[in-house]
Amino acid sequence: MDRKNDGSAQEPRCSFCQKGPDSVKRLISGPDVYICDACVELCNEIIAQEHVQESVDAGKLLSPAEIKARLDEYVIGQHTAKKILSVAVHNHYKRVFFAETLSDEVELEKSNILLVGSSGSGKTLLAKTLARVLNVPFAIADATTLTEAGYVGEDVENILVQLLQNADYDIEAASKGIVYIDEIDKISRKGDGPSITRDVSGEGVQQALLKIIEGTEANIPPKGGRKHPQQEFIRLDTSNILFIMGGAFIGLDKIIEQRMHGGAMGFGVKVASKKETPLSDLLGNVHPNDLVKFGLIPEFIGRIPVITHVNELAEDDLVRILQEPKNALVRQYQKLFELDHVKLRFTSNALRAVARQAIERKTGARGLRNVLESVMLEIMFNLPSMTGVKECVINTAVVEEGKEPIFLYQTEAKTGT
């Protein structure tokens, strides 16, 4: 540093903001330079912000509109659910990426999500697609297999084992992953009041799940399996893991309807019937108290701030699902046939017949593959042995009556017959 002419040293000042020792808490000295505590904090914020910007540039932090647009590529319908999910997921990962820049004055809570809707309506697909869009590790668990620690069944922490395995044991990646717990309605407690007897697969599991969905340091066996005292554990912080839970919640609509319309009696009172209030409208009005009445404990519901529903899929929805998504079943079969140099075509009535069969089986979208597999089995068995086939047409008779499809051979295809 420069010296004064009288030989006395200049008062040390921060080389960045020029503040003296009386204006700052601390000055850190280096070779001919000083930096104050305020500038150190500012530098840390700049570095953290650059880290966040790198994450954004890498596509990890998408806007809600971008997330929904990506979901639209794979999931048909469910626009309200997709909007709610997109906002919740965006806020969750914004909280994760900006954690280093957030002040201690404001604590952002996790945006865990509950999806209510019938089987085959797309709950699992939504969660799985979110993980694909965000490029984070993903794990699916079945709530019906979970029990309290010490009982026959899977410990709740085994959910995290699968997530860690899917992340190739990258703890940092796993700590920002997504876990989908299906059939969450099946662990509702028995009865309205607190359980007096041990309920190892109901209220007990809800109690066991509380900590990991809220955020805790979980001890995980290195290669899965049961814990034992001599074993070394992997510690996984679940504070930034997004938990999405789904269930059919059969009977929840009656609880909602009773709250909305029940209790009023007498002349002049309009009684709402089920026909007047569609199931989707009822589920769209679900409140946390309805879920408590169903059997989820208040503490559990309190850790799931985002609750939405998915609609039952109609015939038109299923027909679109067969054709429109990037991984649509019809597209997949057409690609398989294309590898054998055969064009595959479904008539519109044939696709509707497939959709109707899935509805009759009450399996929703997941039943479409089973129906198509049955329809296509004999065709795909025989086709590789056939010669000269250029086009295969699946009509209603093939789907409903098991008849042979229309095969167009090379000469016929050329003449257009």
Swiss-Prot record:
Belongs to the ClpX chaperone family. Zn(2+) binds at residues 14, 17, 36, 39. ATP binds at residues 118-125. This is ATP-dependent Clp protease ATP-binding subunit ClpX. GO terms for biological process: cell division; proteolysis involved in protein catabolic process. It comes from the Bacteria. ATP-dependent specificity component of the Clp protease. It directs the protease to specific substrates. Can perform chaperone functions in the absence of ClpP. Residues 1-55 form the ClpX-type ZB domain. Keywords: ATP-binding, Chaperone, Metal-binding, Nucleotide-binding, Zinc. NCBIfam families: clpX, PRK05342.1. GO terms for cellular component: HslUV protease complex. GO terms for molecular function: ATP binding; ATP hydrolysis activity; ATP-dependent protein folding chaperone; protein dimerization activity; unfolded protein binding; zinc ion binding. Component of the ClpX-ClpP complex. Forms a hexameric ring that, in the presence of ATP, binds to fourteen ClpP subunits assembled into a disk-like structure with a central cavity, resembling the structure of eukaryotic proteasomes.
